[in-house]
């Protein structure tokens, strides 16, 4: 069983626990999302005047801080870019990684979720979304490098950054990030069993 089929089997296994997982199954089943040779120049996100109070605000706050120190390992993560496409297609809306980070010789891909008072994606959804985005990167990194798909005016060093330095060498770490209220709701109120996420 190849990686794509393995992910699809996991997604189908968890689909009864979260009906929205069918959206992720649609992403990984879309052949246009793999190998599309279309040049892309992502627009620069607004980092100053942030009208949102939800996930975009959390994303900008982490990015604008430039560094995060993980409380458990004291590992320092630098955030050189955000909203990076992981696929190239004719469609104007493309799947993007929320945050791109670097820690020593590792690349960090972060998926963000935020809960205030409205409904939010479950941790099942967020973790599988992150896994599928990483899978898409493993299939598309050569073309993404070819077109230098990142934000040119961000702190990222365009002369040194290359997906090829990380993806084929398994030097990528996936991180799921959310605010406290999100985890209080999903884990604290036992909407899901945390052991189910291991």
Set out the residue ranges of the language-model regions.
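Charged, terminal alpha-helix-loop-beta segments
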Residues: 1-198
């Amino acid at each position: 069983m190849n990686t794509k089929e393995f992910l699809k089997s996991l997604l189908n296994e968890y689909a009864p626990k979260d009906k929205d997982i069918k959206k992720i199954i649609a992403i990984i089943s879309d052949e246009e999302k793999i190998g599309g040779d279309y040049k892309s120049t992502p627009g620069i996100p607004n980092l100053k005047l942030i009208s949102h109070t939800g996930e975009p605000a959390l994303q900008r706050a982490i990015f604008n801080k430039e560094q995060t120190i993980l409380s458990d390992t004291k590992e320092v993560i630098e955030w050189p870019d955000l909203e990076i496409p992981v696929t190239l297609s004719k469609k104007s809306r493309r799947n993007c990684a929320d945050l791109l980070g670097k820690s020593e010789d590792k690349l960090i891909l972060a998926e963000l979720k935020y809960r205030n008072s409205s409904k939010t994606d479950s941790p099942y959804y967020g973790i599988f979304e992150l896994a599928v985005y990483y899978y898409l990167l493993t299939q598309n990194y050569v073309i993404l490098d070819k077109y230098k798909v990142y934000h040119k005016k961000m702190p990222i060093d365009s002369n040194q950054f290359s997906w090829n330095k990380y993806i084929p060498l398994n030097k990528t770490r996936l991180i799921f990030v959310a605010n406290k209220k999100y985890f209080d709701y999903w884990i604290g109120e036992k909407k899901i069993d945390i052991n189910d996420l291991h």
